[in-house]
Amino acid sequence: MTEPAKLPWSDWLPQQRWYAGRNRRLTGAEPSVIVGLRDDLDLVLVDADYADGSRDRYQVLVCWDAAPVSEYSTVATIGAADDRTGFDALYDDEAPQFLLSLIDSSAVRSASGAEVRFAKEPDAQLPLEAMAHVSDAEQSNTSVIFDRDAIFKVFRRVSSGINPDIELNRVLGRAGNPHVARLLGTYEMAGADGTPETAWPLGMVTEFAANAAEGWAMATASVRDLFAEGDLYAHEVGGDFAGESYRLGEAVASVHATLAETLGTSQAAFPVDNVLARLSSTAALVPELTEYAATIEERFAKLATETITVQRVHGDLHLGQVLRTPESWLLIDFEGEPGQPLEERRAPDSPLRDVAGVLRSFEYAAYGPLVEQGSQNTDKQLAARAREWVERNRTAFCDGYAAASGIDPRDSAPLLAAYELDKAVYEAGYEARHRPGWLPIPLRSIARLTAA
């Protein structure tokens, strides 16, 4: 067997778009687990070490001596070892179908004390003959689409513990909730004691949402239509999004209801320490927050004695995490807030966390085009149209949520505003680091929320 340890991991990993160590100096990368799936295919877990003492573990499926699809040959080629070339197997013509067959047969593969378990969901049908291609979407994982039947998400940066995306999709699918793509199968590396808490989730297969449109694309198209019709109100424009926002509110409420029914609810204190810690760390990096910090802190502190109902939620909900099929809205990617520890991503929270995420996303959809045009501070008419669009869709979403659940988010206005503020503070930190030109969007919202 060719030794994957001989491949140039330290050179190849930083070139991948799912690599999470860009702000750290990589000091070394080598395989810690190697499990042969067949003679020319290895499952490899690579440990990447950084100068700050941190470590990430990445999953790479290595196919040997099999040329990848030509258009991907550069990104897929890892390197040579023992006169053979190793490729990222997900870009191979045939390897993804083989991986799907392992899930279909609930196969087990083991080597050197490591055991990889593949599992199919009850009554699931996997498209074993379908053609596969890698999605070109920017992701922290890699998704392989099998015709219009299934999507295979391979986790790249992996960790032990119960994966919330698998967990919640399984719960919602088995409960028959219509607003998720059904889970078809999974695979994982068994933990030391064989329990789910110590296992290493590695990937999942769900139904593919055929003929679906992303919520973000639909919303921004609606905004462009509104901007193009300067003499019409939002409800008069052909691309009005309010009806879809209402239905999205219904879908989110339905998902929340199923999660509450199956996994339960409890009472907890408002997470004042967490939001204050985020505010403090972000304000230290974003000087523009300074003038608002005291007011935000005061708003959070007022909720310190508040008892809230918490349950499992999506955790990172926005318009890029929802798909509109011909039948309904689907919620996808239940992994929680990126970069947070697993235990925090699985922690119960208020459903208002998800509501606030969608409301914040409306702001981005409306004001994003102004930022891209550089006119957010100069074109007062377009800014007013953007505000009109935001308010119309906020109202529609909350109306839909209230109609489906019997709970109106606006009845908890101070708590909802606090979750919106917390999200906007997070956005300010993100934009300051990655897209300074977009910083005015969260700052505008923070100014509005603190003035209310």
Curated annotation (Swiss-Prot):
Alphabetical keyword list: ATP-binding, Carbohydrate metabolism, Glycogen biosynthesis, Glycogen metabolism, Kinase, Nucleotide-binding, Transferase
Higher taxonomy: Bacteria, Bacillati, Actinomycetota, Actinomycetes, Mycobacteriales
Keyword presence, Cell wall biogenesis/degradation: no
Organism from which the protein derives: Mycobacterium avium (strain 104)
Root EC class: transferase
Superkingdom: Bacteria
EC number: 2.7.1.175
Any GO BP: trehalose biosynthetic process
Pathway the protein acts in: Glycan biosynthesis; glycogen biosynthesis
Protein known as: Maltokinase
Catalytic activity: D-maltose + ATP = alpha-maltose 1-phosphate + ADP + H(+)
